[in-house]
């Protein structure tokens, strides 16, 4: 069975509920249930439930049994990956949500804000390739109080994020992003993606990322690299002369004693070509 469990935060509860349905509907001749979870149409993990052990747990035939004793999580086999047929691998999609930008302690006014709609639209060509876009529509703000967009001080580093005022005081409706993305599973526990286009409000370019993430491990490792150019704040599609190569090698750690916390350490080159 292929899908993505999002209803229950407790993984064991989700596995148990699905397992009870399968145990009641499928014949006892079936000895294993395979629940293959996917993310972005890429099979990520196979939860293998031992049917006989689960039925004993579900009927309380074994005292003090735990649902964790009835299943194991492994990387999907290549056969399972090849057999995966997404319910909707192609087609258009659209969504809209509110955004709210705010800053405190500005020279013009203590509190400045911008409220609007971020509309996302795209088209999936297959389970790996898609084109994605975003349009920002400002509904209410007080950014007209700005009496400057870029300060007059000399900067040691190239101005990248310090030009943000030029980008948020443009037309009411702006093109936020338009890019193509390919993502896939490279091998067991290895995943990658590549992308290109207008990647964010201030920069566009091409890039890619590869990640090693073992099933249920506390650690993961990734590397990303991008070549980007700064977008012209006075134009919807034009770029400025400034360009940079940016990227990082990152390590991720999720400690057992803080299960809802992820720690990340990265080293690499930033947009202003400084390193750290």
Regions found by a protein language model. Give the residues of each.
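Transmembrane beta-strand segments that form the barrel wall of outer-membrane beta-barrel proteins
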Residues: 5, 94-106, 119, 131-133, ...
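Outer-membrane beta-barrel initiation region
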Residues: 2-184, 237-245, 254
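Short, conserved, surface-exposed binding loops centered on an aromatic residue
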Residues: 211-213, 241, 253-257
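Histidine/lysine/aspartate-rich catalytic loop segments that bind and position anionic ligands
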Residues: 223-236, 242-246
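Conserved mixed alpha/beta catalytic, RNA-binding, or beta-rich assembly cores of soluble enzyme
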Residues: 211-214, 223-225
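Gram-negative outer-membrane beta-barrel proteins
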Residues: 41-43, 102-108, 139-145, 188, ...
């Amino acid at each position: 069975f292929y899908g993505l469990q999002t209803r229950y935060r407790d993984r064991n509860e989700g596995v148990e509920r699905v397992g009870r349905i399968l145990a009641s509907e499928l014949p006892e001749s079936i000895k294993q249930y395979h629940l293959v979870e996917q993310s972005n149409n890429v099979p990520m993990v196979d939860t293998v439930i031992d049917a006989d052990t689960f039925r004993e747990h579900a009927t309380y035939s074994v005292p003090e049994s735990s649902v964790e004793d009835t299943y194991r999580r492994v990387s999907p086999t290549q056969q399972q990956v090849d057999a995966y047929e997404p319910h909707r691998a192609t087609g258009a999609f659209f969504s809209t949500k509110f955004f709210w930008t705010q800053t405190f302690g500005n020279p013009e006014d203590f509190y400045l804000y911008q409220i609007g709609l971020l509309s996302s639209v795209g088209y999936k060509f297959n389970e790996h390739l898609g084109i994605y876009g975003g349009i920002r529509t400002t509904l209410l703000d007080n950014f007209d109080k700005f009496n400057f967009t870029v300060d007059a001080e000399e900067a040691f580093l190239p101005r990248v994020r310090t030009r943000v005022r030029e980008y948020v005081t443009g037309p009411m409706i702006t093109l936020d992003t338009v890019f193509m993305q390919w993502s896939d599973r490279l091998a067991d526990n290895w995943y990658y993606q590549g992308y290109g286009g207008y990647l964010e409000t201030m920069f566009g370019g091409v890039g890619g990322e590869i990640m090693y993430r073992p099933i249920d491990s506390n650690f993961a490792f990734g590397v990303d690299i991008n070549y980007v150019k700064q977008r012209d704040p006075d134009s919807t599609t034009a770029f400025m002369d400034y360009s940079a190569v940016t990227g990082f090698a990152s390590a991720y750690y999720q400690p057992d004693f803080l299960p809802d916390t992820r720690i990340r350490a990265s080293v690499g080159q930033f947009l202003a070509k400084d390193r750290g």
